[in-house]
């Protein structure tokens, strides 16, 4: 039997141009074990993807700030401190980088994401001045200002508890520093070749191929193992 999966989305299920790879719709709908979509994106994104895959809405959103499993949603992060940091960042001349119509954060409940064009040094300075309750995570796609201690890994532990599956039974695939906590609790972890240094160091295996090419290869190997 194939193992349950914990899958990042951006950089893992996508192409180099950021588009969702069509193979997602070939490989995941019939995966005969739970599939957890674990992302830094706002809650509606992984829910929508699960819906279009025809799978249960088992998701970890906002880097662990929101977890949805078995029809229950848990808010594990607190947006108050991250929003205060971003407001202070603005007051010091910083620009989050999304323009007036910020759909990146429109539905975000527990953190704030800023464009990679934002002033990272200033953002980290402001976040550090706020104390230890807030941290900045660079996913390679955005800077996420989030509650310290909230992580995808803790989200996966919560999902596992709800499903009666130990986190060490999951196979995790990802590409970024926000996947390190998932790799730490999963039984087996893979970084795709485009992964950043933190993810590569934390993963059990760094595969040769990038983006969905790498993920598809891992899934094929997992299927072969169970035949």
Curated annotation (Swiss-Prot):
Q: Which cofactor does it need?
A: Mg(2+)
Q: Which residues form the active site?
A: 8 (nucleophile)
Which UniProt keywords are given for this protein, alphabetically ordered?
A: Carbohydrate metabolism, Hydrolase, Magnesium, Metal-binding
Q: Which CDD domains match?
A: HAD_like, HAD_Pase
Q: What is its EC number?
A: 3.1.3.18
**Protein residues bound to Mg(2+):** 8, 10, 175, 179
Q: Which reaction does it catalyse?
A: 2-phosphoglycolate + H2O = glycolate + phosphate
* Keyword Metal-binding attached: yes
Q: Which NCBIfam families match?
A: HAD-SF-IIB, Pglycolate_arch
Q: What does this protein do?
A: Catalyzes the dephosphorylation of 2-phosphoglycolate.
This protein is called Phosphoglycolate phosphatase
Q: Which organism is it from?
A: Halorubrum lacusprofundi (strain ATCC 49239 / DSM 5036 / JCM 8891 / ACAM 34)
